[in-house]
């Protein structure tokens, strides 16, 4: 029997049920339930279906004209009736995705303390560093299987938001459920409150976090270590997703823990996986292979380098040597092209720096080679922006790229919309509709010469829900690079443009459940092959995916004796 058909036995009654978001049904409680649980008189007379409730909620939602107000309204529903919240979001996923997550969630993070209404998740503050086990035991969620954790230092393109960064784990886990079918009862957002270096927050009397400069060095490392150990003691099988940590911490934390715990960094690995999946789809549409591309990045931080390493891995999988693959990837930051003689290269940048001997014959060769010079000399076929610098993909740069590449692949991925390197409208007009475009934020379709182009949003929500579902269904103990590569290939297999020669580069969000299940199967298979999960047949894995896929439907309640 499916879980939603099996009755749930509850040991409490009365107003307490209406205050519990995971079990509250509001006006959908039946006559029998209203009698058994002492709810008569606490609710209006009419008994509604969840669709009737969702219709009313959507009508209320459409009365708001401001995106932040819409976000706050949806969060209020989430905090009172989670099943209704997810039914509403799933009914309007394309419309509401930008409201519950990027770009609107950025505004919500900036105003988190001012708009605070009700607790959700855990705030683990540095002054409580010796009591982390106690704090985890205080969680209202007991069967946690997926955790998203941030320290709020690098929230989207907005920088240090302190505990305001909690909006990101809340939003990410909303997508795990609405896109990946993970039961909200299994999810827990966590913020590590280690202070903030944002002077506006420190001086704001409404700021609700620990009013202290950020800790760093050994203090920070020991605090995160204590947190990871405590989580493993409390929920040893939970998947931990690191989210929006600063560059100086993101890669070291990932390297330290990826082989100890079931964890991954979405900014580094999730972004890389969805980008590679989108590139594979674009290459299929252009009837070429990723290993035949020359790829230029603007932005050489942890996210950009994570994507680049994933591209290198895929090129190697397609038959190139590592040296050949790395020679086809060009990383540009604010100082110009990364070169192997630069003394300021970070450890994760070093393998991606171009050899000076290989490029000394370029026109305008110097210590600081600009993006335009890279385009003119390297002649890239792929241009990816993760810089957060708006408008830097200029008409001159794009036309220079198009002059040697009939179908340029251009991915301006920076979030939020105000930080995008170029708009799809400009990119398609400058290339007369020939560019293959995917963006990090949502954009409206573009019309060029009477042809309408749907703009694919290269959003991690295409990837991480499926990864989470696959890990959960297979019982995986680790998230390996091979599992991430499998998720990329599975996403590319769902591309309408690659499959049919028309339509968007990525499937519509209305098909996200199908996509997530397809990715979950691919991820689970690799986990089993690598020994990160117990052996099982493909049929059993598929059944486990279906069994673990939660849907927003009310369950019947029965009262236990008390």
UniProtKB/Swiss-Prot annotation:
Parts forming coiled coils: none
Q: Which UniProt keywords apply?
A: Metal-binding, NAD, Oxidoreductase
- GO molecular function annotations of the record: malate dehydrogenase (decarboxylating) (NAD+) activity; metal ion binding; NAD binding; oxaloacetate decarboxylase activity
State where NAD(+) binds: 154, 267, 415
Q: Read off the SMART domains from this record.
A: malic, Malic_M
Write down the Pfam families for this protein, in alphabetical order: malic, Malic_M
The free-text note explaining how the cofactor binds reads:
Divalent metal cations. Prefers magnesium or manganese.
> According to its UniProt record, which residues of this chain constitute the active site?
101, 172
Answer yes or no on keyword Membrane.
Answer: no
Q: Per its UniProt record, what CDD domains does this chain match?
A: NAD_bind_1_malic_enz
Q: Which reaction does it catalyse?
A: (S)-malate + NAD(+) = pyruvate + CO2 + NADH; oxaloacetate + H(+) = pyruvate + CO2
Cysteines joined through disulfide linkages: none
GO-annotated cellular components: cytosol
Q: Does the keyword Cell wall biogenesis/degradation apply?
A: no
What domain of life does the UniProt record list for this protein's source? Bacteria
- Quick one: signal sequence residues? none
**One GO-annotated biological process of the protein:** malate metabolic process
For binding a divalent metal cation, which residues are annotated in this chain's numbering? 243-244, 267
Site positions (Important for activity) are 267
The Enzyme Commission number assigned here is: 1.1.1.38
Per UniProt, subunit arrangement is: Homotetramer.
According to UniProt, the name of this protein is: NAD-dependent malic enzyme
């Amino acid at each position: 029997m499916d879980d939603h058909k099996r009755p749930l036995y509850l040991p409490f009654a009365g107003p307490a049920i209406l205050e519990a978001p995971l079990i509250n049904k509001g006006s959908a409680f039946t006559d029998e339930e209203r009698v058994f649980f002492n709810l008569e008189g606490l609710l209006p007379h009419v008994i509604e279906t969840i669709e009737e409730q969702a219709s009313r909620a959507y009508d209320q939602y459409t009365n708001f004209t401001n995106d932040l107000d819409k976000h706050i309204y949806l969060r209020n529903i989430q905090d009172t009736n989670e099943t209704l919240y997810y039914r509403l979001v799933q009914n309007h996923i394309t419309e509401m995705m930008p409201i519950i997550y990027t770009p609107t969630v950025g505004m919500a993070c900036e105003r988190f303390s001012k708009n605070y209404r009700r607790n959700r998740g855990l705030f683990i503050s540095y002054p409580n560093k010796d009591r982390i086990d106690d704090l985890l035991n205080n969680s209202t969620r007991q069967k946690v299987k997926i955790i998203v954790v941030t320290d709020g230092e690098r929230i989207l393109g907005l920088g240090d938001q302190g505990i305001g960064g909690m909006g990101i784990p809340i939003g990410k886990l909303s997508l795990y459920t609405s896109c990946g079918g993970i039961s909200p009862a299994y999810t827990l957002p966590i913020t590590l409150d280690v202070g903030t270096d944002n002077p506006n927050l420190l001086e704001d009397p409404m700021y609700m976090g620990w009013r202290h400069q950020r800790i760093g060095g050994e203090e920070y490392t020991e605090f995160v270590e204590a947190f990871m150990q405590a989580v493993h003691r409390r929920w040893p099988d939970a998947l931990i997703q690191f989210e929006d940590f600063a560059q100086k911490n993101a890669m070291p934390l990932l390297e330290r823990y990826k082989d100890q715990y079931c964890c991954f960094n979405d900014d580094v690995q999730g972004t890389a996986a969805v980008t590679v999946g989108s590139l594979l789809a674009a290459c299929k549409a252009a009837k070429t292979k990723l290993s035949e591309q020359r790829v230029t990045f603007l932005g050489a931080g942890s996210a950009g380098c994570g994507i680049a390493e994933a591209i290198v891995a895929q090129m190697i999988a397609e038959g190139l040597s590592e040296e050949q693959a790395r020679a086809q990837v060009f990383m540009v930051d604010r100082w110009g092209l990364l070169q192997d003689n630069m003394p300021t290269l970070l450890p994760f940048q070093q393998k991606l720096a171009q050899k000076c001997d290989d490029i000394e014959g370029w026109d305008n060769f110097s210590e600081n080679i600009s993006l335009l010079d890279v385009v003119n000399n390297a002649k890239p076929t792929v241009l990816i922006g993760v810089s957060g610098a708006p408008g830097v993909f200029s008409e001159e740069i794009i036309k220079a790229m198009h002059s040697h590449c009939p179908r340029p692949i251009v991915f301006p991925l920076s979030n939020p919309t105000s930080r995008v390197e170029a708009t799809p409208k400009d990119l398609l007009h400058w290339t007369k509709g020939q560019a293959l475009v995917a963006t990090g934020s949502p954009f409206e379709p573009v019309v060029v010469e009477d042809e309408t182009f749907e703009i694919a949003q290269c959003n991690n929500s295409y990837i991480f829900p499926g990864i989470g579902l696959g890990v959960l269904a297979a019982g995986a103990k680790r998230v390996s690079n091979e599992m991430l590569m499998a998720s990329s290939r599975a996403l590319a297999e769902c591309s309408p443009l690659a499959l049919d020669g028309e339509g968007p580069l990525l499937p519509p969000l209305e098909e996200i459940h199908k996509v997530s299940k397809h990715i979950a199967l691919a991820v689970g298979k690799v986990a089993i092959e690598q020994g990160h999960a117990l052996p099982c047949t493909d049929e059993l894995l598929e059944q486990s995916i279906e069994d673990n896929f939660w849907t927003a439907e009310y369950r019947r309640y029965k009262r236990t004796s008390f």
